[in-house]
A protein has these predicted regions:
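Beta-sheet-rich non-transmembrane sensory/scaffold domains
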Residues: 1-350
Length: 350
C-alpha cells in the first residue's frame, strides 16, 4: 500500500507499507520486506524502539530512465507500519506510533528521517520519539531543514501507592502491634492537550510548547511560512501560532467558531486569506472565509451554508479543487444529499 509519492528531478520516491495478513488457517504472518520479489538485505532494514504496529515501511527511489521503465536505485525498510509519511525535497519522515510504557500510556510517535541523495541512495540519518499523535499530513512541515509538528497528546498514567487504611474497631489491637495498616491503591491521571514541536536536522528538540490548548485535540492544522493555524475539537476555535522563535512557539490570536471545521486551506500567494470546510449545527455543509495577518485578530468575513449534508472532501483533501483568482478563489468538491451525488462549484470574491 503506497502512502506517499514524490518526483524529485529524474527520481521517483515512494513510501509504502507491508502490513500483516491472516492466512486460511487464521495464522497472522508478515512477509519479509522485498523489492521486485527480491528480499532486502539485513543491513537495509532498520529498527526503531517501542514500535506499536507490526509490519514494514519501505522507502524506495527509482530512476526514471524513460516514461516506460523505472530502475530501482535505493531502498530501505523500517520495522513497523507508518501512520504518516511526510516528504520534503530529499528528506522522507516516517511517523510510527509507539507502544505504551509501564504505567504510562501517554500516546507517542516515533519519527525516522531518511535522506535520498542526488544518486538516489536512501539512508536513515536520525530518529526521535515525541509525545502525541499527528492527526493529518498538514500538521507536519519542514522549514529550513527543521521539522515542525502539531500534535494531539492524550496523557494517561497509572501507579500503585501504599495508603493509610481505615480499619474496623476490632482490628485496632492488631494495628497497634503490627504497625499502621496500609492498603495498596491504584491512582490514575488523565489529560489532553495540543503540543507543537520544532526539531532540528538531527531530530533533536529545539523547542516545544504544551500550553497551546489544554483539554483539547487537533481537528485540523496548517503551516504557512512561519505561522501555524489549527482548529481544536471541543471548544471550536481557530488558533494562530507563531513559529518565528522555534524555541518558544507563541499563540498570537484566536477566534471562536460557530460550526465544526474539518478542513483548512491557506494560500501562499495571499497569506491573509483562509477558508474552511465543515458542518453547521444542523448537519449541513458550510464554507467559511477568514482574514488573518500575523499578530492580529482573525476575522470571519463570510459564511455559506450548502444544502448538501456530506462530502468525502471533509476527510480527504485530494477530493477538493481550488483555483486562486486575483481577489478570491473557485472551490469545487463532490457532495451528497437526497438528490444523489453533486459537484457544486463555488466562487468567492472579496
Amino acid at each position: 500500500q503506497n502512502l506517499c509519492t514524490r518526483v524529485s528531478g529524474e527520481k521517483l520516491i515512494i513510501a509504502s507499507v507491508m502490513q500483516p495478513y491472516t492466512d486460511a488457517d487464521g495464522v497472522i504472518s508478515i512477509e519479509d520486506p522485498q523489492i521486485n520479489d527480491k528480499k532486502l538485505a539485513v543491513k537495509d532494514v532498520y529498527w526503531q524502539r517501542d514500535l506499536y504496529q507490526p509490519g514494514y515501511t519501505l522507502v524506495c527511489s527509482y530512476r526514471m530512465a524513460d516514461h516506460t521503465q523505472l530502475e530501482p536505485v535505493g531502498h530501505k525498510a523500517l520495522a513497523g507500519t507508518a501512520m504518516k509519511v511526510y516528504m520534503s525535497g530529499k528528506n522522507v519522515y516516517v511517523l510510527c506510533r509507539t507502544v505504551a510504557k509501564r504505567f504510562d500510556e501517554t500516546e507517542r510517535t516515533g519519527i525516522t528521517k531518511f535522506v535520498v541523495d542526488s544518486e538516489g541512495t536512501v539512508k536513515a540519518t536520525a530518529t526521535h520519539i515525541v509525545k502525541g499523535i499527528v492527526g493529518e499530513g498538514f500538521a507536519v512541515k519542514e522549514q529550513g531543514g527543521h521539522l515542525w509538528l502539531c500534535m494531539s497528546v492524550h496523557h494517561y498514567k497509572s501507579e500503585w501507592k501504599w495508603k493509610k487504611a481505615e480499619v474496623p474497631f476490632n482490628w485496632k489491637l492488631l494495628a497497634h502491634y503490627t504497625g499502621q495498616l496500609k492498603m495498596l491503591c491504584g491512582e490514575e491521571e488523565s489529560s489532553r492537550n495540543v503540543s507543537v514541536y520544532a526539531l532540528d536536522d538531527s531530530l533533536q528538540e529545539i523547542g516545544t510548547s504544551s500550553e497551546i490548548c489544554k483539554g483539547e485535540t487537533v481537528q485540523c492544522a496548517r503551516f504557512l511560512n512561519k505561522t501555524l493555524y489549527l482548529v481544536v475539537n471541543d471548544d471550536r476555535k481557530m488558533i494562530q501560532v507563531s513559529m518565528a522563535a522555534e524555541a518558544d512557539p507563541q499563540v498570537l490570536a484566536q477566534i471562536k467558531l460557530a460550526d465544526e471545521v474539518h478542513y483548512l486551506h491557506l494560500f501562499p500567494s495571499d497569506p491573509s486569506m483562509i477558508f474552511s470546510l465543515g458542518k453547521t449545527t444542523t448537519g449541513e455543509l458550510d464554507m467559511t472565509v477568514f482574514w488573518a495577518t500575523e499578530g492580529s485578530d482573525i476575522k470571519q468575513v463570510a459564511s455559506y451554508g450548502l444544502r448538501q449534508h456530506d462530502s468525502s472532501a471533509l476527510a480527504d483533501h485530494t477530493k477538493i479543487l481550488v483555483q486562486k483568482t486575483e481577489k478570491g478563489f473557485y472551490l469545487g468538491f463532490a457532495t451528497y444529499n437526497a438528490e444523489g451525488l453533486q459537484y457544486p462549484l463555488l466562487h468567492y470574491t472579496a
